[in-house]
């Protein structure tokens, strides 16, 4: 769950709503329905993600149309996901309360630091308003890398 949430910058509600028919194993794609913008997007899945998702699907008991389920087989809830992330933060020894949206922010900052342009990042994260995306690029040191070419 952590890997998928981070790699795709998913909101808690988007993550727990993922269904197996959203995962295109043949083409290595994840179909994401963005909660706030309502716009669907298609993200590439890494080989690591595909392997983890295949294993999860194979081992999921009882079978469910939802990708992430509780131990009882019910769809994972956003509240359950928040509690899980908070517990992981405590177990990791973080001094702050860890919440799932931190994974979304980490995705945004990582992609901005890698030099992904603001419009592409906006589309990837599903932001309607570009101002929500600009926060990631404002702090990215790579934004100045091509200013001077010597």
Which residues make up each language-model segment?
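Catalytic tyrosine of NAD(P)H-dependent dehydrogenase/reductases that use a Tyr as the general acid/base
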Residues: 97-101, 136
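Short coil/turn motifs that cap or connect alpha-helices
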Residues: 11, 19-21, 128-131
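C-terminal catalytic core of tyrosine-transesterase DNA break-rejoin enzymes
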Residues: 3, 7, 87, 104-128, ...
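Conserved tyrosine-mediated DNA breakage-rejoining catalytic core shared by Y-recombinases
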Residues: 8, 17-55
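Catalytic-site neighborhood detector that most strongly recognizes the C-terminal catalytic loop/helix
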Residues: 34, 125, 130-150
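Active-site/catalytic core of tyrosine-dependent DNA strand-transfer enzymes
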Residues: 46-95
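Alpha-helix N-cap/helix-start motif at helix boundaries, enriched for small hydrophobics
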Residues: 1-2, 9, 13-18, 121
């Amino acid at each position: 769950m952590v890997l998928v949430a981070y790699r795709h910058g998913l909101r808690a509600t988007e993550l727990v709503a993922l269904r197996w028919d959203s995962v295109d194993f043949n083409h290595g794609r994840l179909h994401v329905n963005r909660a706030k913008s309502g716009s669907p997007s298609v993200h590439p899945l890494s080989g690591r993600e595909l392997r983890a998702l295949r294993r999860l699907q194979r081992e999921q008991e009882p079978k469910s149309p939802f990708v992430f389920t509780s131990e009882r087989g019910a769809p994972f809830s956003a509240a359950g996901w928040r509690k899980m992330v908070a517990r992981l933060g405590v177990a990791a020894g973080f001094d702050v309360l860890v919440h799932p949206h931190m994974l979304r922010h980490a995705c945004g900052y990582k992609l901005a630091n890698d030099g992904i342009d603001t419009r592409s990042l906006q589309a990837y994260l599903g932001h309607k308003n570009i101002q929500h995306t600009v926060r990631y690029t404002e702090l990215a040191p790579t934004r100045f890398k091509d200013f001077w070419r010597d």
